[in-house]
Amino acid sequence: MTSLRVAFAGTPEFARAALARIHAAGHDVPLVLTQPDRPAGRGMKLQASPVKQLALDLGVPVAQPMSLRLDGKYPAEAAAAQAALLAAQIDVMVVAAYGLILPAWVLELPRLGCLNIHASLLPRWRGAAPIHRAIEAGDTQTGITLMQMDQGLDTGAMLLTAVEPIGPADTTASLHDRLAVLGAELVLQALDAAAAGTLQPVVQPLEGVTYAHKIDKREAPIDWSLPAAVIERRVRAFDPFPGATFSLGGDTLKLWSAQVVDLPAGHGHAAGEVISTEGGTPLVACGEGALALTQLQRAGGKRLSGRDYLQARPVVVGVRAG
């Protein structure tokens, strides 16, 4: 293996796994770029990103500019980051869920370019929330694409891909963790190939482009008029954030797990109606079919099975979930 000088740009837990593998593999990481510390938790105290926390543990210098645009709102911070990158004399930059747009001067600086770890099989699910949207859409597989970055939104040439199945019980949390590991493995292959000069970029096809728009908290409320299968996928897609929310018997709840139940044609139940509690699980009619609510959480409480919830908060058949 040829050791490269690798700048790393990333912020969340997804990116942390890649930084750890790059460093452990023996590549020299002279600089890490990550988002500025943000308020988090109940006390809203400033908290470092997972990538920053790891970089500090590894003794790697960290830069946290608000922007990298030299002509933007924070030109001094961008100029300082530019100086740090130039001084680092990097061969390549690896980018994973960084959260800032990379202007042309960044893309052109490393001799081997900027490699992006994207959590989908491009060109499907370009954009900010590819894991969530793949589950929500009912995709049976997704994966990782290693991409040579350009100035478009996830439009660069594909370098390497790896496929990951999506299981019927997968949530964004479970799929995220597997893809983070897969991305870390794939980026090491890409760095070895880049050092050897054997990477073969493939232009993304024009067909099959979809966009994974950023998840909005306003998507959380459950629309019971939708088919049960659609709602069930959204429940898994929105775990852990923002959660699928609804109201029942005066409680504000998050639904973390549900099972689709077929109903006969002409059943006569309204969407959102609790039609049974037999077997210890609330069964709610949807626009098509019904959902057995198998794991719920009251505001401020812990996650409970449907049975445990009913024991604590009995539900009358016929009431409507909001």
From Swiss-Prot:
Binding site for (6S)-5,6,7,8-tetrahydrofolate: 120-123
Pfam families tied to this protein: Formyl_trans_C (PF02911), Formyl_trans_N (PF00551)
Catalytic activity: L-methionyl-tRNA(fMet) + (6R)-10-formyltetrahydrofolate = N-formyl-L-methionyl-tRNA(fMet) + (6S)-5,6,7,8-tetrahydrofolate + H(+)
CDD domains: FMT_core_Met-tRNA-FMT_N, Met_tRNA_FMT_C
Any one GO molecular function term: methionyl-tRNA formyltransferase activity
UniProt feature coiled coil, ranges: none
Documented EC number(s): 2.1.2.9
InterPro entries assigned: Fmt (IPR005794), Formyl_trans_C (IPR005793), Formyl_transf_N (IPR002376), Formyl_transf_N_sf (IPR036477), Formyl_transferase-like_C_sf (IPR011034), Met-tRNA-FMT_C (IPR044135), Met-tRNA-FMT_N (IPR041711)
Superkingdom classification of source: Bacteria
Record keywords: Protein biosynthesis, Transferase
Name by which UniProt lists this protein: Methionyl-tRNA formyltransferase
Species: Leptothrix cholodnii (strain ATCC 51168 / LMG 8142 / SP-6)
Annotated gene: fmt
